[in-house]
From Swiss-Prot:
Cu cation 4 binds at H415, C473, H478. The gene is LCC2. It comes from Trametes villosa (White-rot fungus). This is Laccase-2. The keyword Metal-binding applies. The keyword Disulfide bond applies. PANTHER family: FI03373P-RELATED, MULTI-COPPER OXIDASE.
C-alpha cells in the first residue's frame, strides 16, 4: 500500500464523525485499513473508509435498503461478515436480521448482500454491527437513528441531528482474534471515534459543540464489545427521554451507567457559563479514571477558547436507576401480575467452565446450517433444531417470562443480555427485589446484575414475531464463548411470515465453498 493511500485511510478514520449520514438507501463497503483513532496505528475494519462505521439515518416508516459490499482481505479479522441492525424487530424479514448461523450464512469476501427491511412503527436510537464471532470489536460498528416526524418529545429540545449522536467504543490495539479470549480491559475509550490510551497522551479528543441557551437531544449509543460506562458531563444534568428505541417519561439524572449495546436519549440544556466541560465515560474495568484526558471528550460552548477543560467532576447524586424509568405512553405488561403469571416461563441457569459459558448446561456452538434455514427445511422441534440444547421453541401468541439469575458461576458480571426481534418489559431490574407489572420500562438490552446483590432480573414479552431470535450476552467475548440461546418463535408460521430472497438462499452455498483461510 502506497504512503499516499495509507495516509488517506488514517485521515479518514480520524474524521469519521464529520462525514454525512447515509441511508435509508446506501451501500456499506466493508474493508480492511490502517486506522489510528487513539493515535496508535493498527489494521482494522472500516465501513466506507471510517471507524466507527458511518451514521445511518431514516424516518419512521422508511424502507431501508442497505447493500453490504464485502472487500475484506485480512483473515485475522475474518474475511466474511454479517451485519445485525440492532433493535429493529424485522417482522417478516427475519432473514435480514443478521446474526451469522442463526439468521443467515456470512457474506463472503468479494460478494455483496442487500439487507432490505421496513421500519413501520419504530423510531429512536439504534445501532448496527457485525454479528460474526468477535468481528465488531475490530471496527464494524456504528450508530443508526430513526427520526419520528411526530416525536412526542419534540417540544423538549431545539437540536437533534448528526452532531448530537454520541458513540462510546472500547478500542483495542490488538485484533480480537489475536488477543486474549477474555481481554482484561480496552486500550482506549473512544467517544465519537476519538480518544487517548496510556501510550498516546496527546491524541486528539472529540469535541461536542453547543450554543448557549439551546437544548440538545443527545443520543448516547454504547457500541461497546465489553465494558459498561458511567457517562456524565461536568456541570450539567441530563434528562433521559428514550431508552433503546422506547420513549420514556422524562427523568433527570447526573450520570448514566450504560451497558454494552444500550442506548439513551437525553436532553442537555446548554445553560451554563460559556466554556469547556469534560465529557466522561469511565469503564467499569481496565484503564479507568481520567488522567491525561483518557475516557474523555470535550463539551465546548460557542465562544469558548479552543482549549482542554479545567472542570472537575462532582459526585453523582442522581444517577440513572432503571426502576425509575417508565414508558411515556402506557405499554401493558404481558401476562398476569404475579411471578410466573405467563403462558411459558423459563429460568436460565448460567455457568462457565473456564473456556465456555453455558445456559441450562448448553454452550452455544454456531451450527453449520443457520437456524432459519433449518426451520425452512422442515425442522420443527427442539430435538430437531441445532445446536442441541440451545434452541427453545416458543408458542405463537403467548406471554413469555424469562428469569436471568446472577451467579458467581458466570464470571464477568454484570452481563448485559439482548433479545432480538422484540422489546421486553423489565419487570424486575438489577439492584431491585421488587416486581413491577404496572409501568416498567421496555427495552432490548438489560443488565442482569451481580450475584452479590442477589439479582434475579426478569423480563417479559409477547410472541408476535415468527422466526428464530437470538438471546445472548452482549459482551462479545462472552457471546463468542457460547453465552447464548435461540428462541424459535412460532415455528409453524416462520416460512409463511418470512419469504426469503434468492440472494439469501445463495449465501450458504457460497460460504460453504470457501476454504477456512477465506472465511
Amino acid at each position: 500500500m502506497g504512503l499516499q493511500r495509507f495516509s488517506f485511510f488514517v485521515t479518514l478514520a480520524l474524521v469519521a464523525r464529520s462525514l454525512a449520514a447515509i441511508g435509508p438507501v446506501a451501500s456499506l463497503v466493508v474493508a480492511n485499513a490502517p486506522v489510528s483513532p487513539d493515535g496508535f496505528l493498527r489494521d482494522a475494519i472500516v465501513v466506507n473508509g471510517v471507524v466507527p462505521s458511518p451514521l445511518i439515518t431514516g424516518k419512521k416508516g422508511d424502507r431501508f435498503q442497505l447493500n453490504v459490499v464485502d472487500t475484506l482481505t485480512n483473515h485475522s479479522m475474518l474475511k466474511s461478515t454479517s451485519i445485525h441492525w440492532h433493535g429493529f424487530f424485522q417482522a417478516g424479514t427475519n432473514w435480514a436480521e443478521g446474526p451469522a448461523f442463526v439468521n443467515q450464512c456470512p457474506i463472503a469476501s468479494g460478494h455483496s448482500f442487500l439487507y432490505d427491511f421496513h421500519v413501520p412503527d419504530q423510531a429512536g436510537t439504534f445501532w448496527y454491527h457485525s454479528h460474526l464471532s468477535t468481528q465488531y470489536c475490530d471496527g464494524l460498528r456504528g450508530p443508526f437513528v430513526v427520526y419520528d416526524p411526530k416525536d412526542p418529545h419534540a417540544s423538549r429540545y431545539d437540536v437533534d441531528n448528526e452532531s448530537t449522536v454520541i458513540t462510546l467504543t472500547d478500542w483495542y490495539h490488538t485484533a480480537a482474534r489475536l488477543g486474549p479470549k477474555f481481554p482484561l480491559g480496552a486500550d482506549a475509550t473512544l467517544i465519537n471515534g476519538l480518544g487517548r490510551s496510556a501510550s498516546t497522551p496527546t491524541a486528539a479528543l472529540a469535541v461536542i459543540n453547543v450554543q448557549h441557551g439551546k437544548r440538545y437531544r443527545f443520543r448516547l449509543v454504547s457500541i461497546s464489545c465489553d465494558p459498561n460506562y458511567t457517562f456524565s458531563i461536568d456541570g450539567h444534568n441530563l434528562t433521559v427521554i428514550e431508552v433503546d428505541g422506547i420513549n420514556s417519561q422524562p427523568l433527570l439524572v447526573d450520570s448514566i451507567q450504560i451497558f454494552a449495546a444500550q442506548r439513551y436519549s437525553f436532553v442537555l440544556n446548554a445553560n451554563q457559563t460559556v466554556g469547556n466541560y469534560w465529557v466522561r465515560a469511565n469503564p467499569n474495568f481496565g484503564t479507568v479514571g481520567f488522567a491525561g484526558g483518557i475516557n474523555s471528550a470535550i463539551l465546548r460552548y460557542q465562544g469558548a477558547p479552543v482549549a482542554e477543560p479545567t472542570t472537575t467532576q462532582t459526585p453523582s447524586v442522581i444517577p440513572l436507576i432503571e426502576t425509575n424509568l417508565h414508558p411515556l405512553a402506557r405499554m401493558p405488561v404481558p401476562g398476569s401480575p404475579t411471578p410466573g403469571g405467563v403462558d411459558k416461563a423459563l429460568n436460565l441457569a448460567f455457568n462457565f467452565n473456564g473456556t465456555n459459558f453455558f445456559i441450562n448446561n448448553a454452550t452455544f456452538t454456531p451450527p453449520t446450517v443457520p437456524v432459519l434455514l433449518q426451520i425452512l427445511s422442515g425442522a420443527q422441534t427442539a430435538q430437531d433444531l441445532l445446536p442441541a440444547g440451545s434452541v427453545y421453541p416458543l408458542p405463537a401468541h403467548s406471554t413469555i417470562e424469562i428469569t436471568l439469575p446472577a451467579t458467581a458461576l458466570a464470571p464477568g458480571a454484570p452481563h448485559p443480555f439482548h433479545l432480538h426481534g422484540h422489546a421486553f418489559a423489565v419487570v424486575r431490574s438489577a439492584g431491585s427485589t421488587t416486581y413491577n407489572y404496572n409501568d416498567p420500562i421496555f427495552r432490548d438490552v438489560v443488565s442482569t446484575g451481580t450475584p452479590a446483590a442477589g439479582d434475579n432480573v426478569t423480563i417479559r414479552f409477547q410472541t408476535d414475531n415468527p422466526g428464530p431470535w437470538f438471546l445472548h450476552c452482549h459482551i462479545d467475548f462472552h457471546l463468542d464463548a457460547g453465552f447464548a440461546i435461540v428462541f424459535a418463535e412460532d415455528v409453524a408460521d416462520v416460512k409463511a411470515a418470512n419469504p426469503v430472497p434468492k440472494a439469501w438462499s445463495d449465501l450458504c452455498p457460497i460460504y460453504d465453498g470457501l476454504s477456512e483461510a477465506n472465511q
